[in-house]
A protein has these predicted regions:
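Class I S-adenosyl-L-methionine
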Residues: 2-179
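Short acidic/His/Gly/Ser-rich catalytic and metal-binding motifs that mark active-site loops
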Residues: 1-4, 47, 201, 238-240
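C-terminal target-recognition/interaction regions appended to catalytic cores
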Residues: 140-269
Length: 269
């Protein structure tokens, strides 16, 4: 299910064909005799409505009407940050399993902060490269770098009095305080999106550290290594060489942290 752009309203969600791919899953469940079934999507997925026996039902009621005679059905929204992943990423998880079987709830864990997860990695500025695999900073516009150097940890450059986001003519850029924003060391990372390459997108900038001159270090987005860590992906992953930095970031932005799925499926008995 898409959670951006034209999917922001209930009406438009109901009229976007992509959001009905779920019905193909239902068709497969009808044909096959699975013991366990896992369906995953964004939390808004649970608000979708489908026709059953002439009635328009929300997803949970729809599945219950279709399959409750054969399966126990559990519907939850699990946030990755409560399951050992240093990223806030809520996901809708539907678990279906035959009535004689067991699927236990995943056990919550304490939150892991960004400081714990990536605070040990070398500081990098735009375009710099470290000796660690995948720990290479993207190159950013000088105007973006300048305003982020004067932006404290956890703050947006839109809050700056002098060094705020500007157009080439010096005019202030219009935008939200969720963009041009640094992350917070003492919290998990925010949800990683497909635009983790852009300083101007949502809360993508490294937390940084205050320097002796009053500016802040690491005026850049997270490196791939940092993104892998906060997404519970092996930071030394050998992905295909033909895949670009941008493409890998898009994959991560569309993905589910593998450790979250592991915590869910290990409850199968």
């Amino acid at each position: 299910m898409s959670n951006i752009g034209k999917n922001k309203t209930d009406f438009l969600r109901q009229n976007d064909s992509r959001n009905f791919l779920f019905l193909s899953v239902v068709d497969v469940i009808k044909i096959k005799d699975f013991d366990y079934i896992l369906i995953e999507n964004v939390p808004q997925f649970l608000k979708m409505k489908y026709f059953y026996d002439g009635k328009l039902l929300e997803l949970t009621d729809y599945l219950s009407a279709m399959f409750s005679d054969k399966y126990d059905i559990k519907v939850n929204v699990f946030n990755a940050k409560y399951f050992g992943i240093p990223q806030s990423r809520p996901r809708a998880i539907v678990r279906m399993y035959k009535k004689h079987l067991t699927w236990n709830e995943p056990k919550e864990q304490r939150e892991i902060t960004l400081k714990e997860a990536i605070g040990h990695l070398p500081s990098l500025e735009s375009g710099e490269i470290s000796n660690l695999k995948h720990h290479k900073a993207r190159v950013h516009k000088e105007s973006h770098i300048e305003c982020m150097r004067y932006t404290p940890t956890g703050k947006s450059a839109f809050e700056n009095i002098v060094y705020f986001p500007k157009k080439e003519n010096g005019e202030r850029v219009k935008g939200f305080k969720s963009s041009y924003k640094r992350m917070k060391w003492e919290q998990p990372a925010p949800t990683i999106t497909i635009r983790s390459d852009a300083i101007s997108s949502q809360e993508n900038v490294h937390p940084g550290r205050k320097q002796a001159d009053g500016t802040y270090s690491d005026a850049r987005v997270l490196t791939l290594r940092e993104l892998f860590i906060v997404s519970s992906i092996n930071p030394d992953w050998d992905y295909p060489e033909e895949y670009s930095d941008t493409f890998i970031r898009q994959i991560i932005g569309e993905s589910v942290p593998p450790k979250l799925m592991y915590q869910v499926v290990k409850g199968i008995k």
